[in-house]
Amino acid sequence: MGKADIVIKGSKDGLTFFLDSQCDFSELAAAIETKLASADFFLVGAHVTVDVGTRQLHPDQIERLQTLFPSYGLILRGINSWADPVGQHDEEERVVLKGNRERIYQIANHLYESTERADGAARNYDYRDESASSFSPVGTAPDYAEATTEPADCFGGSPSDMQTAILTQGGDERTLLIQRTLRSGQTVRYPGHVVILGDVNPGAEVVAGGNIIVMGVFRGVAHAGAMGSDEAVVTAYRLRPTQLRIANHITRPPDEEEEGPEHPEIARIRDGMVTIERYHYGTKSYGKDV
C-alpha cells in the first residue's frame, strides 16, 4: 500500500486524515491503526476529522472509524465526504457525517477498561462530556480526552471530584493537570504540558511534549520536550530524578547524591547540556535574577 493512501495534515483545529477514495477501506483502517499505534500516545486528546473524498461509506465503515480513533485517545469530530447519498453529483456539496458521541465514549471507555499495559498497570481514558465553568481555568473541557493510570472507577462522582483535568490556555497549548502522587510503575504521556500536584515516586515516569511541572518531589523518570523541543523545562519543588531527559539530551544523577537544597529547582538545556539550577520566581530567564 502506497504512502499516498493516507495523508495527515495538522492545523489549529486539529488533525485531518485524507483517505484515498480508491483504496480498499479495510487496508486504510489497518494503516490508520498502524500510524496511531506508532504515535505511542503522543496524539492523545487531538481532535480529528476524516476526509474520505468521494467514497460513500457504509454504516459499518462509519462505526469502524468512530471506534478506531477513540480507542487510541483521539476525539473524532466528523467524517467529511464529497459523495452524494444517492450517487448524484450535480452539486458538489460536502456531506458531514457525525456519529453518536455518547456511543463513541461508551465504546472507548470499554476498550480502555479492558486494556492493560505490559507492566500490569492499567491505562484508562475518560471520554465523558462534562463541561466546566467558563470562568474556571481548570476543568474537564468538552471534546478533550483525559489520561490517567488509575483504575476507571476513580472517575466516579462530579467533575470537581475528578483527579485529572485539562487546563485550557491561550493559543493551541494544552496542559494535563494531575492532582495526585504518581506511584512506582505508573506512566503519564501527554503531547502538551504536564502539571502534577503531588510527588513523582521512584519507578514512575512522566513523558511530555512540552514542560513538566511538579508541585512536589520528583524522584522518577522525566522526559520533557519529547517531540524534540530544546526549550522545554522540568521544574519541581525538589528535583531528584533517576533519569532526566529534555528533547534528545539525557542526564542521570551521581550514584551517591547529596540530599540537596530545600528550594524549587528547574532543569533546562544550557550550552547543549541538561543543567539543574535554582528556580527564581518572577524571572523571565530561569535561574537568573532580573
UniProtKB/Swiss-Prot annotation:
Family matches, as Gene3D superfamilies: 2.160.20.70, 3.30.160.540
Gene: minC
Protein name per the record: Probable septum site-determining protein MinC
Annotated InterPro entries: CAP/MinC_C (IPR016098), MinC (IPR013033), MinC_C_sf (IPR036145), MinC_N_1 (IPR055219), Septum_form_inhib_MinC_C (IPR005526)
NCBIfam families, alphabetized: minC (TIGR01222)
Keyword flag Cell division: yes
Annotated family: Belongs to the MinC family.
Quaternary structure, from the entry: Interacts with MinD and FtsZ.
Keywords: Cell cycle, Cell division, Septation
Annotated signal peptide: none
Physiological role: Cell division inhibitor that blocks the formation of polar Z ring septums. Rapidly oscillates between the poles of the cell to destabilize FtsZ filaments that have formed before they mature into polar Z rings. Prevents FtsZ polymerization.
GO biological process, one term: cell morphogenesis
